[in-house]
Regions:
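N-terminal leader/targeting and accessory segments in enzymes
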Residues: 9-10, 14-99
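Short, polar loop motifs at secondary-structure junctions
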Residues: 73-81, 229-233, 250-251
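Thr-Gly-centered strand-to-loop micro-motif
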Residues: 38-39, 51-53, 140-142, 167, ...
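Adenine nucleotide phosphate-binding catalytic loops in nucleotide-utilizing enzymes
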Residues: 16, 205-206, 213, 239-264
C-alpha cells in the first residue's frame, strides 16, 4: 500500500495535501489509496488517478474509464457530471500532484539521496543504489523519471518497507530544482558536475551552478552535500547550510578519492 489515506494522519487529500475540494460520498473519506498514477492504463483497484493535460491528450477524458477499473478517487481541474466515484476539484492537477508527493515524502521514515548534475546522474544513481542495496531496502528512480512529473510518481512508489530512496533530479531552467527538492527533501545531495547543458535557459555555467544548487534550500536539517572536487564550479562551494561539503574526486586532497582504477 502507498498509504495515502483520504483522511487522517497519513494523507488528507481534501485538506492538508493538495488544497482541493472533495466532491462525493462522505462515507468514502476513510478509503485508503493503494497507488497513484497518471496513466489510465495503470489504474488498479483502490488507486488515485491524476489526469494530466498534455499537448495531444487530456487525461480527464479517461476519468469514466478509470472508475470502471476500480479507481478509488480522481483529481480534476473541472467539475464532473455524474461521476462514478469521488473526486477532488483542484486548480491544477500537476501542482496538486507535487503537493501530494511533498506531503507523502515528509510522512515517511526514510533517508533520501538526491542526485543531480549536468551529466552522469543516471550512472551515479545506479552505482549508489547498488552499494546501498547490499545493506538496505532501496527505492530508486526508474528510467528517466527525474522531472516535475516523474519525480512525484517515483516518490509515490516508496513503500514502508523501503529504508532509502535514491532520487534523480533533472532540470533545464531556474526554479525547477526548487520545486523538485521541495518534494524530495534530500538527506544527502550529490551533484556530479556543472556542465554546458541548457545554456539557452541558464545562460552560462554560473547559471547552471545557481540552478543546480537551488536544492540546498530544501535539504533536511542535518543533510550533507556531496560534491565533485574535480569540477571548478562546484569547488567554489565551501559550505552548504552552514556545514562543510563532502568532496569526492581523483585527487587525494578530496574527502573521498579513488586509489585504484580498473577497466573491464
Amino acid at each position: 500500500e502507498i498509504r495515502l489515506s483520504l483522511v487522517g494522519s497519513e494523507m488528507c487529500i481534501r485538506d492538508r495535501a493538495c488544497e482541493g475540494t472533495y466532491i462525493g460520498d462522505e462515507t468514502l473519506l476513510d478509503t485508503t489509496i493503494t497507488g497513484a498514477v497518471i496513466d489510465s492504463r495503470q489504474v488498479k483497484e483502490g488507486y488515485l488517478f491524476i489526469p494530466i493535460k498534455g499537448e495531444r491528450v487530456d487525461g480527464h477524458k479517461f476519468i469514466p474509464t478509470v472508475f470502471e477499473q476500480g479507481a478509488a478517487i480522481v483529481l480534476s481541474e473541472h467539475e464532473l457530471k455524474d461521476p462514478a466515484g469521488p473526486y477532488v476539484l483542484v486548480e491544477s492537477t500537476t501542482d496538486a500532484m507535487k503537493k501530494l508527493a511533498a506531503f507523502y515524502r515528509k510522512s515517511l521514515d526514510i533517508k533520501v539521496v538526491g542526485i543531480t548534475g549536468s551529466v552522469g546522474k543516471t550512472s551515479t544513481k545506479e552505482m549508489i543504489s547498488s552499494v546501498l542495496e547490499q545493506k538496505y531496502s532501496v527505492h530508486k528512480t526508474a528510467g528517466n523519471f527525474n522531472n516535475e512529473i516523474g519525480l512525484p510518481l517515483t516518490i509515490f512508489g516508496i513503500r514502508e518497507s523501503h529504508q532509502v530512496a535514491v532520487l534523480e533530479m533533472g532540470i533545464s531552467d531556474f526554479g525547477e530544482m526548487h520545486r523538485l527538492s521541495t518534494m524530495s527533501c534530500p538527506d544527502v545531495m550529490v551533484i556530479t558536475n556543472i556542465g554546458y547543458c541548457h545554456l539557452e535557459f541558464l545562460g552560462d555555467r554560473d547559471g547552471v551552478l545557481k540552478a543546480k544548487t537551488e536544492c540546498f534550500e530544501h535539504m533536511m536539517p542535518d543533510a550533507v552535500a556531496v560534491l565533485n572536487a574535480d569540477d571548478d564550479k562546484l569547488a567554489t562551494v565551501q559550505t552548504v547550510n552552514g556545514k562543510p561539503a563532502i568532496y569526492y574526486g581523483k585527487e587525494s586532497a578530496s574527502d573521498v578519492h579513488k586509489s585504484v582504477y580498473t577497466t573491464n
